[in-house]
Design a protein with these regions (language model features):
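Bacterial N-terminal signal peptides that target proteins for export
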Residues: 1-8
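Hydrophobic h-region of N-terminal signal peptides that target proteins for export
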Residues: 10-17
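A short, N-terminal "cap"/entry segment at the start of jelly-roll beta-barrel domains
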Residues: 21-68, 151-153
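Short acidic-glycine-tyrosine-enriched beta hairpin
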Residues: 62-64, 104-121
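Conserved short histidine dyad/triad with adjacent acidic residue
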Residues: 68-84, 119-121
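Glycine- and acidic-residue-biased ligand/ion/polar-headgroup-sensing regions
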Residues: 75-77, 85-103
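Short beta-strand His + acidic residue motifs that chelate non-heme Fe in jelly-roll/DSBH
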Residues: 80-82, 100-101, 123-130
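Ligand-binding loop in jelly-roll beta-barrel domains
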Residues: 120-144
Length: 153
């Protein structure tokens, strides 16, 4: 994928989103003066403990505490059974094919450039189709959580 396209997409998303950084007052004032610019190669990826192979790179805020922006990388062939999140989440697909739906039969595929906005507590399945890993920009309006839901009968 063209890195310029990737960085333009992320930069545009960040420009439209207020930065939520956990920094001191003096540093916060300074951060308002300088843009946040990072290349894809400079991202600091960390493994998501609950989902082996899934990684994230925080851009702003803290997903363990409240509002945040981050990049996510999910291995191709990953399936997440029924679950929900406590806060609203927006995803912008960069590469791969992300799928989501109220259940597996109704799940839709979303390729590069797609925007998927999830309301808080929406019960759904999600994952990354086999063939290539999924990379997407994610913005959460509150703390990130993953609440498994018992399968519907």
């Amino acid at each position: 994928m063209n890195r310029f396209f990737l960085l333009s997409l992320v930069a545009g998303s960040l420009a439209a989103t207020p930065a939520h950084r956990a920094v001191s007052t003096a540093a916060a004032a300074e951060s308002e003066k300088a843009p946040m610019m990072v290349s894809f190669a400079e991202l600091k990826w960390r493994e998501l403990p609950e989902r082996k192979g899934t990684q994230f790179a925080v851009l702003s805020g803290d997903p363990g505490v409240g509002q945040y922006t981050q990049m996510r990388s999910v291995p191709g062939g990953t399936d997440n059974p029924l679950h929900a999140h406590s806060s609203e989440i927006t995803n912008v697909v960069i590469s791969g094919v992300l799928y989501m739906g109220a259940d597996a039969p109704s799940a839709k595929d979303f390729g590069p450039g797609s925007v998927v906005m999830l309301p808080a507590n929406w019960v759904h399945v999600s994952g990354c189709r086999a063939g290539s890993d999924c990379v997407f920009y994610q913005e959460g309006k509150g703390k990130f959580d993953y609440k498994p839901i018992a399968a519907r009968e």
